[in-house]
Amino acid sequence: MPEPAASSRGCVLGFDFGEKRIGVAIGEHLLGIAHPLVTIDAEANDKRFAAIAGLIEEWQPEMLVVGLPSYLNGDEHALTQLCRKFARRLEGRFNLPVQLVDERLSSAEASQTLKQSGISGRKQKSVLDQVAAQHILQSYFDGLAS
């Protein structure tokens, strides 16, 4: 895991929002590489935002990236609006720019990545959301490079 001092190189936090858990990843604009960081395992908004505030204080990101889910055909579903609301709250509470990124298939890709690494079952469940956040953030970085 990178050190908190990485913020001087353009630290970015990425989020895979879920109603029960939020996966968090970290990366740097300079390197363009995302890493899984942590899973926030709380349903209550006050606990979620307290955990996020701690991460923002520790890592001092210059911006945030939030995955925006949709159906494969691009149509939005119920979680899409919740993610938009989450992104607006992040921007309002922390006064940081928030970029929404298409997250179709991020959880499936994360699960595949973990299986290829020999991680399955309960262990996979404990890190799946942060690896999905890693895929979302990496997608953002890859979009900048193209």
Swiss-Prot record:
Subcellular location(s) of the protein: Cytoplasm
Enzyme Commission number(s): 3.1.-.-
Function, as annotated: Could be a nuclease involved in processing of the 5'-end of pre-16S rRNA.
Family affiliation: Belongs to the YqgF nuclease family.
InterPro entries according to UniProt: RNaseH-like_sf, YqgF, YqgF/RNaseH-like_dom, YqgF/RNaseH-like_dom_sf
HAMAP family found in the cross-reference section: Nuclease_YqgF (MF_00651)
Origin organism lineage: Bacteria, Pseudomonadati, Pseudomonadota, Betaproteobacteria, Nitrosomonadales
Protein name (database record): Putative pre-16S rRNA nuclease
Gene Ontology CC terms: cytosol
Source organism superkingdom: Bacteria
One function term, GO molecular function aspect: nuclease activity
Keywords (A to Z) from UniProt: Cytoplasm, Hydrolase, Nuclease, Ribosome biogenesis
Gene3D superfamilies: YqgF/RNase H-like domain
Gene Ontology biological-process entries: rRNA 5'-end processing
UniProt signal peptide: none
Pfam families per UniProt: RuvX (PF03652)
Positions of disulphide bridges: none
